[in-house]
Design a protein with these regions (language model features):
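N-terminal secretory signal peptides
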Residues: 1-3, 31
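N-terminal export signals
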Residues: 7-29
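C-terminal segment of N-terminal export signals and the immediately downstream linker at the start
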Residues: 22-45
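Short catalytic helix/loop segments, enriched in acidic residues and glycine
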Residues: 59-78
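Glycine/threonine-rich flexible loop motifs
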Residues: 122-137, 165-171
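C-terminal and late-domain segments of enzyme folds
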Residues: 205-209, 213-335
Length: 335
């Protein structure tokens, strides 16, 4: 399926411009794009709610914001098309036609693989079937392994694919795992972009930087996975897009205000009301990049009078376990 510059390309480049793509980057990108007819993108959906896809679509429709950052100029530079080979939600084809694409594209090489949703591994992966191959069910786990072989980059879009997230919360009966827990042999290809959902500018900006041939510096810290167990993992978050803990003097706009003790108050710090922004692993740039579109004022969670729920945190949604059994799960941390 082809998505022209008024679709995928415009969204992706808008993100790059908004995140600081300079003239040198644009000139380099022009050379890269002119040397190729398309950039293949495979978007695989596993156990999730399609929220990251919806986040992506919101950016595509954001015409006003594009003009605000003059991204239509960059759009003219990065012209032609990006070839979104497979996306089960957005494809015009369905059923067997969809599967023909899926079962042929993984044999090619050089594509960017975007993975949305956690990967169920229980019952040999049969809790999540993405289609059929040779008349047999094709699990998301097997599809992920197949596409990982020839992928140039593997982007875990959203907290479910990056850290298990909501899909792997609680007792995790379907034994959901994160992408990097399954693809251990392709560790250097993987880029985690957590968020529930992933921020569209972060996803788009990451793709732009990869196309420009830039090396993304990653965090080398470790953090607990969702479910509250003792498993430790490299978070693989690019520092450019995940620069600091949200609860900081330069990142949180509410930190300077009084501590609120009631919900529904404006311009108050919600640290005592359960805000997860102060957690050492709530590292994200969502407030500086902002959420939403112009008609909803692009305020994001904090600007809308809410608190941070820590959706980019590897422990999200913060399940508490007693003797290995999930006893509660709360996105808030009341003091």
């Amino acid at each position: 399926m082809k998505m022209t510059r008024r679709d995928f390309l415009k969204w992706m480049v808008a993100s790059g411009v908004a995140l600081g793509m300079g003239k040198m980057d644009i000139a380099k990108a022009e050379e890269i794009i002119n040397s190729a007819t398309s950039t293949p993108v495979i978007w695989l959906q596993a156990a999730g709610c399609s929220g990251c896809t919806l986040s992506f679509l919101d950016m595509v429709e954001n015409e006003t914001y594009d003009k605000t950052v003059a991204c239509y100029n960059a759009e003219d530079v990065l012209m032609n098309t990006i070839d979104l080979k497979y996306h089960s939600t957005l494809m015009a084809s369905a059923s067997s036609e969809c599967m023909e694409v899926l079962n042929s594209e993984y044999k090619e090489s050089g594509y960017i693989l975007v993975v949305e949703g956690g990967i169920p591994t229980g019952e040999s992966g049969n809790y999540c079937i993405v289609g059929e191959r040779d008349g047999k069910p094709l699990t998301a786990m097997q599809a992920l392994k197949d596409f990982a072989v020839n992928a140039k980059y593997i982007i875990a879009a959203g907290t479910c694919s990056a850290f298990r997230g909501v899909s792997g919360a609680g007792d995790n009966l379907t034994e959901v795992k994160a992408v990097d827990q399954i693809l251990t042999e392709y560790d250097k290809k993987i880029i985690n972009l957590p968020g529930c959902p992933v921020h569209p500018y972060i996803l788009g900006g990451t793709i732009v930087k990869l196309l420009l041939g830039e090396t993304l510096e990653m965090f080398t810290d470790t953090a607990r996975t969702s479910g509250g167990d003792s498993t430790l993992m490299n978070t693989k978050r690019p520092k450019y897009f995940y620069p600091a803990v949200l609860h900081g003097s330069t990142t949180c706009p509410l930190l300077k205000f009084n501590k609120s003790t009631t919900l529904g108050t404006c311009r108050q710090c919600f640290e005592r009301m359960g805000c997860r922004g102060h957690d050492a692993n709530t590292i994200v740039s969502c407030y500086t990049k902002l959420w939403g579109v112009d008609w909803m004022n692009k305020k994001g969670c904090l600007g809308a009078g809410s608190m941070c729920i820590g959706c980019s945190n590897p422990s999200f949604p913060f399940t508490t376990k007693t003797n290995g059994v999930a006893t509660s799960s709360s996105i808030y941390n009341f003091k």
